[in-house]
């Protein structure tokens, strides 16, 4: 245990589990006591009674769990959380646990053990060593857990508690004052770059500069007024077997022609009076008069009849 880094004045919690030899446990406790000296302390705790103990939070510099060669234990998430609770900030946890090479409900893999340590709030989780279990330990583990696999090994993990307490708070210094920004220097304009984009009047009068005459761009045909038929697209209203249909955003006049045709088709010729006295009222109208039931109107006034009335007439 000398390679762990336990020094004088440290407080160590040694967690042991069955089966453990009392002699081996006593020798390890005495060895740790000699390391920490009179200013330190070594406490012993059984794994099964750890959750029922009343250890103060953040009271140990070290927690050593199942590090005896003749013992083993599968650490639950509750046990790992309790160990993380009693460790001081920046304290260390060293544990040993049997792992398997394949996923199993009884014994987990080394990767899952690392994940469980991180979920308990510990950091800097590293795998220190890994060695095969002795036949006696394998037999005892199968009896204890019911595991029936053969890919078993013993792994030692090291982890640290963060240098702050869980749930601790710290005041943040925030400044909401308006910050004065330094004046930004205006970039200096390159005279060569400005000269490249400048065209002077002298350059316009230069004989080497070819200017295009705008009047020469049009010929005599461009000034002729186009015929309406020439403006129509080849496919505009095309087809003799189908009705002419104007294109979208038509500009050739076909849309106006179609609109006039549709208005003319909707015009209904109103029946004309034969007696000339229909406008006076029902008293002066014939029995088959289409204006029966309508009020009197002025001569020449436009009257629109319903389709039902025309059908009945």
From Swiss-Prot:
SUPFAM superfamilies xref list: S-adenosyl-L-methionine-dependent methyltransferases
Pfam families the UniProt entry points to: Anamorsin_N (PF20922), CIAPIN1 (PF05093)
Region of interest (N-terminal SAM-like domain), residue spans: 6-170
Region described as Fe-S binding site A: spans on this chain: 236-252
Motif Cx2C motif 2, residue range(s) on this chain: 286-289
Sorted UniProt keywords: 2Fe-2S, 4Fe-4S, Apoptosis, Cytoplasm, Iron, Iron-sulfur, Metal-binding, Mitochondrion, Nucleus
Name of the protein in its database record: Anamorsin
Originating organism: Oncorhynchus mykiss
């Amino acid at each position: 245990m000398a390679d762990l880094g336990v020094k004088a004045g440290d407080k160590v919690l040694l967690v042991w589990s069955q089966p453990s030899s009392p002699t081996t446990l006593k020798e390890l406790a005495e060895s740790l006591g000699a390391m920490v000296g009179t200013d330190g302390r070594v406490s012993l705790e059984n794994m099964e009674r750890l959750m029922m103990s009343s250890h103060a939070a953040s009271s140990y510099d070290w927690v050593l769990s199942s590090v005896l060669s003749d013992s083993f234990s599968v650490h639950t998430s509750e046990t790992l959380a309790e160990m993380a609770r009693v460790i001081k900030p920046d304290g260390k946890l060293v544990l040993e646990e049997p792992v398997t090479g394949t996923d199993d409900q009884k014994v987990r893999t080394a990767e899952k053990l690392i994940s469980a340590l991180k979920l308990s709030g510990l950091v800097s989780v590293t795998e220190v060593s890994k060695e095969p279990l002795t036949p006696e330990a394998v037999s005892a583990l199968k009896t204890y857990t019911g595991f029936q696999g053969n890919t078993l090994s013993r792994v030692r993990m090291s982890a640290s508690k963060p240098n702050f307490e869980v749930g601790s708070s710290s005041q943040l210094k925030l400044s909401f004052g308006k910050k004065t920004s330094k004046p930004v220097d205006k970039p200096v304009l390159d005279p060569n770059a400005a000269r490249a984009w400048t065209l002077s009047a002298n350059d316009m009068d230069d004989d080497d500069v070819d200017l295009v005459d705008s009047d020469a761009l049009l010929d005599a045909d461009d000034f002729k007024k186009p015929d309406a038929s020439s403006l129509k697209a080849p496919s505009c209203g095309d087809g003799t077997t189908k009705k002419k249909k104007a294109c979208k955003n038509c500009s050739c006049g076909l849309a106006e022609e179609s609109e006039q045709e549709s208005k003319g088709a909707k015009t209904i010729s109103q029946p004309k009076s034969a007696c000339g006295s229909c406008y006076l009222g029902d008293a002066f109208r014939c029995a088959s008069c289409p204006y029966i039931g309508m009020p009197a109107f002025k001569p020449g006034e436009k009257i629109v009849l319903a389709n039902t009335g025309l059908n009945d007439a």
